[in-house]
């Protein structure tokens, strides 16, 4: 049984095992907890790439609160309008927030997205002047194989 009293409920993703009504309710509660409405909380279908969506204003009706609505396949959001609260969901991957004169970016950064340049894309999009990195998996719990090393070397050199 999930604790339904938390301000940011964990059951926020539509999946095979999730009750759509619960997900809608939890996303509505999450938006309220940050002082906004679901249409002001951009969210995407995170696919471990470097694509970023740009949002200039709230989306109504919101795909964020509607089960069965196809979400854009993006791992980052740039918001340029007032009243928007971009959201990424993470477990092992890093949440990265960037801010600058061009807006605010919220990025879902797994190793594939990092190697593909998602942080650079987000930083350029908002002309980043500041950044914050949230918690993610560390070396104690994630083994990096030669395929990961090869991708990073191809992207960034030795």
Language model feature labels by segment:
Residues 1-158:
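Active-site microenvironment for binding and transforming phosphate-containing groups
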